[in-house]
């Protein structure tokens, strides 16, 4: 019996037991979190156990070291060196394989001219035409069953001008090489195409060019490897549908990592990035976008280097892609279910998938069945007189305490906005922790204050029922969102899981009441309110408790007395000050009322019909009331808390650094933090009012620490820097001044940093900082002249870009007023790969340009010196982007056709039609090499000294990236 007494004491609903169980729960969640984030680092293949995998990893790491030795954007000569190295490696791997073929776009001089929407801004109405000369390297491995739909594996080998491209996308490229090496040894059943593509960074152009290749007709599926962060684990960022998600589930058995929350966030444009997967998806392919996703403040900076990543990160991407490609290459695929997928992994051990449409149907079932069951059980318990009636004060305690916590949270968020709005960039844990502790602490204080004056029995069960009602409302709203989005809101699944488990807990309580001991009188109110100065328990309840005490066996007497003492000791209403209302929360009884209620019989041992309850029935009731809370706790707290915490962490981990990208992103991150902390708090709120003083003291202490860290600590450090965008602009139409543009977040960050630069503080250079859109700040100053070319004389910037008008018939008398105007330009640019022409008419709202022609020079076909590509657009063309490979080819030859104003508005009475038909052309040409030198008058000088100065003298709490596709932009303008 002593063991039983200990067991009952440990499991009884007491403050200490509850607090200990909460501690254990959160400790387990913390350990699982650490395990999830660290386990992949311990799974590298060992040479003695997996020699083939070890060789693939070591070879890939060596390849990565070579291709990330320098910056290699499309606009640099280093880009060609990376291309040549990859081509050499591809030829080495394929060797004399009978089923392998290699195609080099650079050798075949492949180019495309096409119209595209801005791939990084879907809301843009700017009509863009792009000319691109490709240097993609494609490899075809013909499968044993070539009639099966093929698989494309893709990664891009260009970097941005300010990054080495280790993660973006060097790891993807060397993973493709490893996959190629593996499949050469293990011939696939279906045909595989490998696309080592170029110039993803400035328009996803390598992927677009793929569909100009005849091999594109062989592939239906795609695995795109990308890096939109700087290391960590490679996540299944998005996938086409439920079928492809299940293929990932079936193939990636070791260290799966994916979450459809990322997919919803990406499609909702909370992340301002894109990958080649967008192009493949738009062209009807189905597949998987596997990418690194954090941290974004190192993404596209000098820290995207091999020093800031690891073999563990490389192996995670390589092994994931290898498992997936091997499965797809060798198995028949079930691709019937093309509805969007909800998916997530459990600490890298198990991957779960459900169709978003199926989830919606289940939500509908939950929404319909759960209230019917709950109401039915309520009616049964009321009919059996086992329902405990609650006052309106009792019903409002839980929701009002939750509302008060949200209000306090909102007030605190206002303090964050005023004092430290970018704090999430440094560490999102502290603000989330502050929000979370605010909610639970406010709930604790209000519920216990209410219970002090108006005691309520069974507050826990009432709160669980109210939580069920709140979650039912939330699930109704989210289900509507899921349906209206055509099932693309794939990140809402955690709420369905939370609702299901909370519903089970609430139904169990209602079921216990419905099946409870029947009485002949309705139970009175269980909660003392301001309308009554006595407890209104029915006589039957009190007599029944008395009978229970009389009928207990003698050998259980000591245990029973201990239990009763613990109940009174832990009661939420017992206090040393104020009214002494000792409410037995499990038995629904105010012990003090027994002395004052005239309905209480003088003899508790009365043998009346109402008191004739068996010892067995009372024992069962006591057993339920003692231990049922554990079942409710285990249903509501551990699993929902882990899933909700993990979901919030997933969101914040991907988005916290986006606060640097504008005030809108800052608001989004703050909003996600507030809502996320409420969701994390909800599972424990029905229980938290009963924790002991140590737990609540630690909660208050954690809030004070979190709040101070959130409000007072500087948001940027060496490991979490502020990312600033750089460009140096030279407008030849306004002189040769080399104006440096530095773009970053408002908040007195940029100007103090710039004022400390030697070239500024020793020359009194003026810095002009102005606010631009979306909470950003642009600072401009005249910087040191760039040295873009090697020369034996003085560098003349004006000679870098020259525009020659070869033909223009706007004022020709031979042209009819109704005839389109035609002009031909020769754009002379030295050692350049990228330029942009922008067309604008001062007298027409839309661009009048309807046709663009690009005249190409083919090195392999000198007899066909001018090969033309032409594109037409009825809606007008605003911009022409030019990308060429040959640095020695110093000209772009362009033809432009535009409509006269007479054709667009039909105003024949306008006497200035000639002037109104003028077309303004703005030219911008880009240079992206900075980590190299030019030789000027026999002396080696840095190409972009203004950028070098920023890198060398700015505090380590700043990182730098390019504002546009080049670091130096030379501009000019003409009127045709």
Swiss-Prot record:
Transmembrane spans: 16-36, 360-380, 393-412, 429-449, 462-482, 497-517, 628-648, 669-689, 693-713
Cofactor requirement: Zn(2+)
GO-annotated molecular function: metal ion binding; metalloexopeptidase activity
A family per Pfam: Peptidase_M28
Biased composition (Polar residues): 549-558
Catalytic machinery residues: 200 (proton acceptor)
Vacuolar side, ranges: 37-359, 413-428, 483-496, 649-668, 714-976
Residues bearing glycans: 96, 121, 189, 217, 656, 768, 796, 811, 866, 937
GO BP annotation list: proteolysis
Post-translational events: N-glycosylated.
Bilayer topology: Multi-pass membrane protein
Family of the protein in this entry: Belongs to the peptidase M28 family.
Name used for this protein in its record: Vacuolar membrane protease
């Amino acid at each position: 019996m002593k063991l039983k007494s200990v067991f009952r004491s440990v499991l009884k609903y007491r403050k200490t037991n509850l607090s200990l169980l909460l501690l254990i729960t959160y400790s387990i969640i913390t350990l699982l979190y650490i395990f999830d984030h660290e386990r992949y680092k311990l799974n590298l293949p060992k040479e003695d156990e997996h020699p083939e995998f070890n060789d693939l990893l070591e070879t890939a790491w060596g390849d990565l070291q070579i291709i990330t030795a320098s910056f290699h954007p499309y606009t640099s000569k280093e880009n060609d060196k990376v291309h040549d190295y990859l081509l050499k490696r591809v030829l080495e791997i394929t060797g004399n394989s009978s089923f392998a073929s290699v195609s080099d776009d650079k050798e075949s001089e492949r180019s495309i001219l096409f119209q595209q929407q801005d791939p990084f801004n879907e809301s843009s109405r700017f009509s863009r035409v792009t000319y691109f000369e490709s240097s993609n390297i494609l490899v075809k491995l013909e499968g044993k069953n070539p009639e099966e739909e093929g698989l494309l594996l893709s990664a891009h080998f260009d970097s941005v001008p300010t990054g080495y491209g280790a993660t973006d996308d060097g790891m993807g490229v060397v993973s493709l090489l490893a996959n190629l090496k593996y499949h050469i040894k293990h011939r696939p059943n279906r045909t595989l195409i490998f696309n080592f593509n170029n110039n993803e960074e400035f328009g996803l152009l390598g992927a677009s060019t793929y569909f100009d290749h005849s091999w594109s007709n062989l592939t239906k599926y795609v695995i795109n490897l990308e890096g939109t962060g700087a290391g960590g684990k490679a996540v299944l960022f998005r996938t086409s549908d439920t079928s492809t998600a299940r293929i990932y589930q079936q193939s990636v058995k070791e260290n799966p990592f994916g979450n459809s929350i990322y997919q919803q966030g990406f499609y909702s444009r909370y992340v301002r990035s894109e990958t080649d997967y967008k192009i493949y998806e738009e062209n009807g392919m189905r597949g998987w976008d596997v990418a690194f996703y954090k941290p974004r403040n190192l993404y596209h900076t000098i820290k995207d280097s091999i020093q800031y990543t690891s073999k563990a990160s490389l192996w995670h991407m390589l092994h994931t892609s290898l498992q997936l490609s091997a499965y797809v290459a060798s198995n028949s695929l079930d691709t019937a279910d093309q509805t969007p997928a909800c998916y997530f992994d459990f600490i890298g051990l198990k991957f779960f998938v459900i169709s978003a449409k199926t989830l919606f149907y289940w939500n509908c079932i939950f929404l319909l069945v759960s209230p019917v069951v709950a109401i039915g059980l309520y009616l049964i318990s009321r009919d059996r007189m086992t329902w405990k009636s609650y006052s309106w004060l009792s019903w409002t305690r839980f929701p009002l305490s939750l509302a008060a916590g949200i209000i306090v949270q909102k007030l605190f968020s206002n303090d964050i906005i005023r004092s430290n709005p970018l704090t999430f960039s440094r560490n999102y844990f502290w603000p989330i922790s502050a929000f979370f502790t605010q909610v639970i602490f406010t709930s604790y204080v209000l519920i216990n204050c209410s219970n002090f004056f108006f005691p309520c029995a069974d507050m826990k069960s009432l709160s669980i029922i109210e939580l069920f009602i709140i979650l039912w409302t939330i699930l109704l709203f989210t289900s509507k969102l899921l349906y209206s989005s055509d099932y693309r809101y794939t990140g809402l699944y955690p709420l369905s899981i939370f609702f299901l488990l909370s519903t089970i807990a609430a139904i169990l309580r209602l079921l216990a009441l419905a099946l409870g001991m029947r009485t002949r009188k309705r139970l009175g109110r269980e909660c003392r309110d301001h309308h009554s100065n006595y407890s209104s328990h029915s006589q039957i309840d009190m007599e029944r408790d008395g009978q229970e005490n009389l009928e207990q066996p003698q050998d259980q007497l000591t245990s029973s007395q201990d239990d009763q003492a613990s109940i009174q000791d832990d009661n939420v209403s017992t206090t040393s000050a104020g009214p002494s209302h000792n409410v037995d929360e499990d038995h629904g009884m105010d012990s003090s009322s027994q002395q004052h209620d005239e309905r209480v019989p003088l003899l508790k041992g009365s043998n009346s019909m109402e008191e004739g309850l068996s010892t067995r029935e009372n024992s069962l009731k006591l057993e339920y009331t003692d231990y049922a809370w554990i079942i409710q706790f285990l249903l509501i707290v551990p699993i929902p808390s882990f899933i909700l915490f993990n979901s919030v962490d997933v969101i914040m981990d991907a988005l916290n650094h986006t606060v640097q990208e504008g005030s809108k992103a800052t608001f989004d991150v703050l909003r996600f933090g507030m809502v996320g902390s409420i969701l994390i708090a909800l599972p424990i709120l029905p229980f938290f009012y009963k924790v002991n003083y140590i737990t609540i003291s630690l909660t208050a202490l954690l809030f004070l620490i979190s709040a101070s860290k959130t409000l007072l600590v500087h948001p940027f450090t060496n490991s979490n820097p502020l990312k600033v965008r750089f460009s140096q602009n030279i407008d030849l139409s306004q002189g040769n001044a080399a104006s440096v543009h530095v773009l970053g977040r408002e908040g007195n960050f940029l100007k103090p940093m710039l004022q400390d630069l030697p070239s500024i503080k020793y020359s009194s250079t003026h810095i002009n900082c102005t606010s631009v859109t979306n909470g950003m700040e642009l600072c401009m100053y005249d910087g040191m002249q760039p040295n873009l070319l090697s020369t034996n004389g003085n560098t003349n910037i004006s000679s870098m870009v020259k525009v020659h008008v070869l033909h223009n018939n706007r004022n020709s008398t031979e042209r009819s007023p109704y005839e389109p105007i035609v002009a031909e330009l020769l754009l002379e640019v030295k050692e350049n790969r990228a330029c942009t022409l922008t067309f604008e008419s001062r007298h027409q709202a839309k661009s009048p340009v309807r046709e663009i022609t690009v005249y190409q020079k083919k090195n392999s076909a000198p007899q066909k010196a001018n090969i033309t590509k032409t594109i037409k657009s009825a809606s007008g063309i605003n911009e022409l982007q030019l990308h060429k490979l040959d640095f020695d080819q110093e000209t772009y030859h362009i033809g432009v056709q535009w409509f006269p104003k007479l054709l667009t508005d039909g105003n024949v009475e306008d006497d200035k039609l000639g002037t109104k038909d003028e077309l303004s052309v703005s030219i911008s040409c880009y240079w992206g090499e900075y980590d190299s030198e030019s030789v000027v008058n026999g002396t080696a000088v840095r190409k972009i000294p203004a950028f070098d100065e920023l890198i060398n003298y700015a505090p380590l709490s700043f990182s730098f990236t390019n504002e546009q596709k080049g670091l130096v932009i030379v501009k000019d303008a003409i009127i045709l």
